[in-house]
Curated annotation (Swiss-Prot):
This is Lactam utilization protein lamB. Belongs to the LamB/PxpA family. It comes from the Eukaryota. Involved in the utilization of lactams. Required for the conversion of exogenous 2-pyrrolidinone (gamma-butyrolactam) to endogenous gamma-amino-n-butyrate (GABA).
């Protein structure tokens, strides 16, 4: 397939510490990214961490989005839960609203909403889950999601702007779905470079089964997601930035 048609950006999940427990070298990562998805207290984060993360993003001119997850701090939002559609809508409103308070205080605009972890995976697989979560997104705010899944369909059906994601540190299965591990596994920088370059240059990915899977993103804006809790995340994001910068320069973006 052909290269993507727009400038690629890098987004990263941030503010995923809790109390005295730290997660990820956020301050070291901020100069390397374009967009931050800030945890909103359900899978990680707390009021003080949210406030500090918003301030740090503002200082680095980073676009800020809400990163709502399932109410499961112990499992870091990576354990599936059964919630009603009403609950899914409500927890989204609650978490996005919490972040909005800190954004308003700092004069920072809410750029988007990007669901976290297993909730993201549930939305990819289940249209009703995707729809319920998206009903909790404020009017006029885009959603980040995986193209070709129920996230894209629900967003389009509800008139929500959809922005596509590729992944720098997550593998895909042969159906083009993400393989979400409870605990992140290390990546070799050479594998990260190959993984990201294939997605940008060919709109495809080599699955865990060795199958080349197309990932058509149409004309959506696109960013590469990396995670601050991945082992070696600093090298992963430096490698991703190298590939992204080379791609954008090559195609004049």
């Amino acid at each position: 397939m052909a290269p993507i048609k727009k400038k690629a950006l890098i987004n990263c999940d941030m503010g995923e510490a809790y109390g005295n427990w730290t997660c990820g070298p956020d301050l070291e990562l901020l100069p390397l990214i374009d967009i931050a998805n800030i945890a909103c207290g359900f899978h990680a984060g707390d009021p003080l961490i949210m406030m500090e993360t918003v301030r740090n993003c503002k200082a680095h001119n980073i676009l800020v989005g809400a990163h709502p997850g399932l109410p499961d701090i112990q499992g870091f939002g990576r354990r599936e839960m059964k919630l009603s559609p009403e609950e899914l809508t409500a927890i989204t409103i609650y978490q996005v609203g919490a972040l909005q308070g800190f954004l308003d205080r700092e004069g920072v605009r809410l750029n988007h909403v990007k669901p976290h972890g297993v909730l993201y995976g549930m939305m990819c697989r289940d249209y009703e889950v995707a729809k319920a979560v998206m009903l909790g997104i404020p009017k006029g705010i885009p959603v980040f999601g995986l193209p070709g899944t129920n996230m894209e369909k629900a967003a389009n059906d509800l008139g929500i702007e959809f922005r596509a994601e590729f992944y720098g540190d997550v593998k895909y299965d042969s159906n083009g779905m993400l393989v979400i591990d409870r605990k992140k596994k290390p990546w070799d920088p050479a594998d990260v470079e190959k993984h990201v370059r294939q997605q940008l240059e060919d709109q495809s990915v080599t699955s865990v089964d060795g199958v080349v899977v197309p990932l058509p993103i149409k004309d959506y804006d696109v960013s590469i997601c990396c995670h601050s809790d991945s082992p070696g995340c600093l090298e992963i994001i430096k490698t991703t930035k190298k590939v992204v910068d080379e791609f954008n320069k090559k195609y004049g973006f």
